[in-house]
Amino acid sequence: THAEGRETISNGSATHAEGYKTTASGKYTHTEGSFTNASGDNGHAEGNLTTATGVNSHAEGRQTIASGSASHAEGRQTTASGAQSHAEGWLSIASGFTSHAEGYTTIASGSYSHAEGHFSTASNDYTHAEGNQTTASGSASHAEGIGSMAIGNYSHAEGNTSVSVGTSSHAEGDVT
């Protein structure tokens, strides 16, 4: 174990803590920066107020949390809580298994879901929401553009405020 800096704590097997008020516990963890905490085995927390509690997790930036196993949170106030999830940007949340949320206030909660852009939500398994205020809630659905919603399973909505409701349906254009 190795601790350097001010008020750092390195407690565990082969841990490393450096900076100001950082804590590395567990096995093979590494923290650096200020007020960082890595407690999941092989976890890494860096930056300011970051926390890596999942096994093999990585949190970086400011106020990020990587709690899922093999998860990665980066940016500002992002949370990666699903196993193998990735959250990046600002206020993004990846809670589904192998989910990916990126941008500003995006949410990927379904397994294998992907939300990107601004206020986009991918809430079911295999969904993809991209753009501004888009929602993909049907299983394996895809919403893109501005305010588009793919509600039906396997549906696709694209454009400006397009809504696709039925199974395997497709809506595109302006307010369709």
What are these regions (language model features)?
Residues 1-176:
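Periodic small-residue-enriched repeat registers in elongated scaffold domains
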